[in-house]
Design a protein with these regions (language model features):
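Residue-identity detector for glycine
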Residues: 6-7, 11-12, 26-29
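Glycine-rich phosphate-binding loops of nucleotide-dependent enzymes
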Residues: 26-279
Length: 279
C-alpha cells in the first residue's frame, strides 16, 4: 500500500476519499494517504511542460506514471530532460503546463518541504550530503519535520544500510562516492516516503559500486517504496526496473517493461547503443 504523511488536512474530515486513495488523520496529526488498490497510479506526471528560463521549455508534454510498489526507470540521451522531470515533480523547476498528482492529489508546483511532508523523497545527483556533518547528523537532517521518530527511523536506516551504522560518527565529507550516495538515500528515506525520486544514483561510481547501488535501490523498492530513477546506465537500469520510459527532447518517446524496452529494436538502435557508449 502506498502511503504519504504530512500535516493535517485543513477543514477536512478525519477520513475522505480522493480518487483511489483514502486520507486518514494518523498519529500526531499526520496526513496518511492509503492506496485502496483499484489500479490508479501513486504518482503521475501528465503532459508536463517545464523549464528553467522563461520561454524556454525543457519538458514538452512529458507523461510518466508510477504505480504502488513499482520501480520506474527513466533513460534517454543527454539533454532529453530526465533530471528536469524529477526536479519538476519535486517543485524545483517551474511547471508551465500539465500536472503532477500524488495519490490523486494535485501537487503541481508544490514546494519541496510540502512534498516531503506528503511522502515524496528526492536524492539529487550532486551536492547530496552535508560534508561537515557526521553520517548520523546527515540522517537527522532528513527527519527535521518529525523529530519524535528519530530513534525509530535511525534504527530502520542502519538495518537497511549497515555500514552507515558502523560509521555513524564519521564526517560525510570523508566518504567515497558510493558511501555518500548511501547517506543521501538514507536521509531521503528518513521520512518514510511512499515515493522516492533518484537522479542518476550510479553517476561517477565504479562498476562494482554501481552494482551495489542498483541492488540497494531494488532492496528499498522491495520495502514498498515506489521508486522513479533517472539513469544514464540505460542497460543496467532496464534490467532492474519494472517499467521504463525513454525521454527524448522533453517527451516520452517509448515506454514499456524494462525487458520490452531492452529488446525493442528501435530503442536499441536509437538509444541503447549511444547510451552504452556513455557509461
Amino acid at each position: 500500500a502506498a502511503r504519504c504523511e504530512g500535516g493535517t488536512e485543513a477543514g477536512g474530515s478525519e477520513s475522505r476519499e480522493i480518487d483511489s486513495c483514502k486520507i486518514d488523520t494518523g498519529q500526531e496529526g499526520q496526513l496518511m494517504v492509503v492506496y485502496t488498490g483499484d489500479g490508479a497510479p501513486v504518482l503521475e506526471a501528465k503532459d508536463l511542460v517545464a523549464g528553467y528560463l522563461p520561454g524556454i521549455n525543457i519538458l514538452n508534454g512529458c507523461n510518466v506514471r508510477a504505480y504502488p510498489g513499482e520501480l520506474i526507470g527513466i533513460i534517454g540521451p543527454n539533454g532529453a530532460g530526465k533530471s528536469t522531470l524529477l526536479k519538476a515533480i519535486f517543485g524545483l523547476v517551474p511547471v508551465r503546463g500539465g500536472s503532477v498528482t500524488l495519490a490523486g492529489q494535485d501537487i503541481t508546483n508544490s514546494k519541496a518541504n510540502r512534498l516531503v511532508q506528503l511522502g515524496v523523497g528526492f536524492v539529487p545527483q550532486n551536492n547530496n550530503v552535508f560534508p561537515t556533518l557526521t553520517i548520523e547528523e546527515n540522517l537527522q537532517m532528513g527527519l527535521y519535520l518529525r523529530p519524535r521518530l528519530l530513534a525509530q527511523r535511525l534504527a530502520a536506516m542502519y538495518e537497511l544500510f549497515p555500514v552507515l551504522g558502523e560509521r555513524r560518527s564519521q564526517r560525510a565529507g570523508g566518504l567515497s562516492g558510493g558511501e555518500r550516495q548511501s547517506v543521501a538515500m538514507a536521509r531521503a528515506l528518513m521520512m518514510d516516503p511512499s515515493v522516492l525520486l533518484l537522479d542518476e544514483p550510479s553517476a561517477g561510481l565504479s562498476p562494482v559500486r554501481q552494482d551495489e547501488t542498483f541492488l540497494r535501490t531494488r532492496r528499498i523498492n522491495a520495502t514498498g517504496v515506489s521508486v522513479v530513477m533517472v539513469e544514464q546506465n540505460a542497460r543496467r537500469c532496464l534490467q532492474i526496473c519494472d517499467r521504463g520510459y525513454v525521454l527524448d527532447q522533453g517527451r516520452d518517446s517509448h515506454s514499456g517493461t524494462g525487458h520490452e524496452l531492452a529488446d525493442d529494436p528501435k530503442v536499441i538502435e536509437l538509444y541503447l547503443g549511444t547510451l552504452a557508449d556513455e557509461v
